[in-house]
Amino acid sequence: MAPKPNPARPDTDPVHGQTVEDHPAHPHPAASSSSGPSARQRLASLASHLLPGGNTEFDYVIVGGGTAGAVLANRLTEDRNVSVAVIEGGPSDVGNDMVLDLKRWLEMLGSDLDYDYPTVPQPRGNSFIRHSRARVLGGCSSHNTLISFRPFNEDLDDWANNYACPSWPASTVQPYGDRLKMNIVPVAPQQRNQVARDWVLASSKATGAPVLEDLNAHIVHRGGFQKAVGFFDIAYDPYSGQRSSASVAYLHPIMPHGPHKRHNLHLFLETWANTLVYDSNDSSKVTGVKVTTKHGLSKTLSARREVILCAGAIDTPRLLLHSGIGPRSDLEALGLACRHNVPGVGLNLTDHPESIVMWETRDTPPETVMSSDAGLFLRVLPSHAEPNPHPGPDLMFHIYQVPFADNTERVGYERPKHAICMTPNICRSQARGKVSLASADPKDKPLLDFKYFEDKDNYDERILIEGVKWARKIAEQSPFKQHLVKEIAPGPAIQSDKDIGEYARKVAHTVYHPAGTCRMGTPSGIHGGEGKDESVVVDQKDLRVVGLKGVRVCDASVLPTLPTINPMLTILMVAERAAELIRDDAWVDGLRKSNYH
């Protein structure tokens, strides 16, 4: 999805992508008088070639060609008798070195491939946080650092036991991790520079955390860990440094110029989904999506079976709200008709907030895979500090070998030329916010209110206070301390818990993991659900939007809570399971349904 069509970019990559026919319903009068084909006619001819007959009806319409959407597009088109359309707001990533070269991920922040959503003012946090959201095929897996961790068993069992998701325990979900197509490996030894190696040893020495060579394998075989330090598992090719994103792994092989192209896959690139379309005879049934190309021309893409929303934790609730699905009072306040009152749409917004501790260094360390190749995991508060006690770590550190100084400079700190940053990260933030609409205009960016550090008991702030203290202890260890010149931020003058907490909140940032805004659960009155939980948007049994037919959600928005560590693999695993649920629903007693709805 895209917040606004970009007139500088084409609707399609004619080699690697496909698009809707881009011509008006009523041709311009000059078109018939020209001696040769007009530009619009040539474009229409190209579109007709790519989509025979100007096809706008498919079995499945997927909104969002990102992390989850790529998985679903691949798995559903394995049935050659099924046609699948993917609506993607950005361009193809094929041949784009800025996207495919993992080392260049920082170049994409704030670029034309970034939706760059601001946050609303945060009374207790940093009001200047920009949430980077990818505008490119592959979504955030084409935009992030590809740090790849399976969820801890306890993360998934928490959904089952405490969030009315009995269909999603670890025993059910973990096997889907074995199906992932991405190449996930620890950072290659030859790409581990001495600074990162020394930091890993210093972290272990200061905290007692064991050094694990393959953190992900430890999760797979033991279900998780409480503390550990080591180099990350990353989805990449260690020889070329190229991404193994969801797009590269799931879409590139089956696209028109891929080695296993599938003619039943139709990519609509640089195409914006405006609203859902309802059956004229059944207001509870979704039958398609209204879309707009960058030229402002509109089409309706119809789904014979289902529409599947994979636009992410920001744009999936945004599309639902613009389609009249959400809290009645919020919609009517903007002049939007409420077609289905689903109060939970946009609620439960959560994230992995982080702060920063920065030291000046003498020079920039040798380049690594993506400047943040190792991590530390600790338990710093007692388990009863959380509403649902969790045995895993509650604090995570990244080490960045570049100066992340925007937020510190804003509050008066110097910007060093060379720096190392440790970023304490809250594994299970207790703050919950909201995504809402700024106006009834689909082109306007939504309002993101994460309510950073507004959780009761100041749990999130307490985690960061402990994180700053541990960072300083690590910096005292040899040989790592030989790389450091001086502490820049928060600086030696900041010592009390009160001062550390205030600093940590003011310069806090995000690791870009918004989730939970269309959370799954058990709707009241069905599947044995008790009571009424209005925060549930998606039925955990099948990922269908509560009270509607023909529309499902599969992306980070359905997660009741974030997993302890980076959520990308969790989202991929949810998508693998969703594909299986969707395919199974299309068959009865070994026969394909003739009337899907």
Question: Which sequence ranges carry the predicted segments?
Answer:
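Glycine-rich loop(s) and the adjacent beta-strand/alpha-helix scaffold that form part
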Residues: D79-A85, G90-G95, L100, P169, ...
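Mid-to-C-terminal "cap/lid" subdomains and adjacent gly/pro-rich loops that border
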Residues: H260-N264, P317, L321, I325-R428, ...
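A glycine-rich dinucleotide-binding beta-alpha-beta segment and adjacent secondary-structure elements
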Residues: F268-L269, N274-V277, P479-L562, L569, ...
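A conserved FAD-binding loop/helix module that cradles the flavin
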Residues: T561-E580
